[in-house]
């Protein structure tokens, strides 16, 4: 099957062969959104108005109807500075003192959204209501969840953003819960919180929460609070240790290549001092084997076709009878990643997310892995596990 997309990029290939996955299709992400989290529009109907029926005069009925309608409109209209301060305090008292539902009613959600919009407008700041998987995010629930934990600084210091995000029931495929909801809060509510703190309207027991919640720190295996590049580099290091044991030389199994330097530097130093020159020579030969392994790993050339996708990590290793390609494509499902191979020694990895407007900035990409020998595309296989870890075995041409 010839890939017409590759011909448009002026790349010369032979007959590209589709590579099939070896495991079953993962389950589709469930729609776990809570309907109460999505703000509903407030209908300003007059179905409950009497319209003058049953009253002692038509004028009395009209006055009663206008008063009820005026009360409804005032609930959504911008307040003066003094009234805004009282309303902001009410949001905290309702959630903390009375223990009501953090999500709030649809009326409360819309009212709080209007209040935040008015604050940003008064501060001459741009405000864009956040969306999570295409649905408006309940910022009232996000505000109450963070404030009840002690505010932005406490949640960030104690790495509680995952706990905040889990309360929104994100899909199982969402692997950046902490980063996503911290980003939502920073863009929509952080300036609002700072203003309340500076005005003395928001007093939170930060030190007490830091001590009490230290045990509930967020696991850092797949999450991080740093930049996107730092998180992806961490994921790449985890991918390198995925296949920890490999064959070296005449079938000898070595230890994993990814280790903590602090754990191996001190024992090595002691052995060199105690044993002497003979042990030093043996260590040098082992270093030579590791160097050869590194050279084999960096032998392949990876080229981007179209926009550069530096967040996709690809490593290639050469074994006795095949090439082994280890790739990390976080945020993509198996059906969104396409693999093709050419007998001339080229493997094409294409990623096409179904949802282009995603909160992680995942964009379509195409990478060509140029191997150093001819391959057998008919026996090429791929396995994709959780968190976007992709393994491709490419046998040599027989």
Swiss-Prot record:
GO MF annotations, alphabetized: minor groove of adenine-thymine-rich DNA binding; transcription cis-regulatory region binding
Keywords: DNA-binding, Nucleus, Transcription, Transcription regulation
Superkingdom as given in the UniProt entry: Eukaryota
Keyword Nucleus: yes
Residue span(s) of domain sHSP: 305-398
Originating organism: Arabidopsis thaliana
Transmembrane segments: none
The protein's name: AT-rich interactive domain-containing protein 6
Gene expressing this chain: ARID6
Location, primary (coarse class): nucleus
């Amino acid at each position: 099957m010839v890939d017409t997309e590759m011909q448009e990029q002026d790349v010369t290939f032979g007959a590209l062969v589709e590579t099939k996955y070896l495991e079953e299709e993962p389950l589709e992400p469930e729609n776990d959104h809570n309907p109460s989290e999505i703000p509903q529009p407030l209908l300003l109907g007059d179905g409950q108005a009497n319209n003058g029926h049953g009253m002692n005069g038509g004028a009395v009925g009209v006055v009663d109807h206008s008063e009820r309608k005026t009360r409804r409109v005032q609930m959504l209209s911008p307040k003066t500075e003094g009234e805004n301060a009282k309303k902001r305090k009410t949001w905290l008292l309702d959630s903390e003192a009375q223990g009501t539902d953090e999500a709030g009613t649809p009326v409360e959600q819309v009212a709080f959204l209007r209040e935040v919009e008015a604050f940003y407008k008064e501060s001459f700041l741009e405000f864009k209501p956040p969306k999570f998987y295409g649905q408006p995010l309940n910022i009232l629930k996000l505000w109450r969840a963070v404030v009840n934990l002690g505010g932005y600084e406490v949640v960030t210091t104690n790495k509680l953003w995952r706990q905040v995000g889990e309360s929104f029931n994100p899909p199982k495929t969402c692997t950046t819960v902490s980063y996503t909801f911290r980003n939502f809060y920073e863009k929509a509510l952080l300036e609002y919180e700072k203003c309340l703190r500076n005005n003395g309207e928001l007093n939170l027991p930060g030190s007490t929460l830091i001590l009490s919640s230290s045990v509930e720190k967020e696991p850092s295996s797949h999450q991080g609070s740093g930049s996107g590049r730092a998180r992806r580099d961490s994921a790449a290091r985890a991918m390198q240790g995925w296949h920890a044991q490999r064959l070296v030389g005449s079938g000898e199994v070595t230890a994993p290549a990814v280790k903590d330097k602090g754990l191996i530097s001190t024992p090595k130093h002691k052995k060199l001092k105690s044993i002497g020159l003979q042990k030093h020579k043996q260590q040098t030969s082992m270093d030579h084997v590791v160097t050869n392994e590194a050279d084999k790993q960096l032998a392949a050339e990876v080229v981007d076709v179209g926009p550069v996708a530096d967040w996709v990590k690809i490593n290639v290793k050469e074994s006795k009878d095949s090439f082994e390609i280890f790739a990390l494509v976080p945020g993509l499902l198996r059906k969104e990643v396409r693999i093709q191979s050419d007998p001339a020694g080229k493997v094409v990895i294409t990623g096409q997310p179904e949802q282009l407007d995603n909160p992680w900035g995942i964009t379509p990409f195409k990478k060509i892995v140029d191997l150093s020998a001819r391959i057998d595309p008919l026996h090429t296989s791929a396995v994709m596990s959780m968190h976007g870890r992709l393994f491709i075995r490419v046998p040599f041409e027989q």
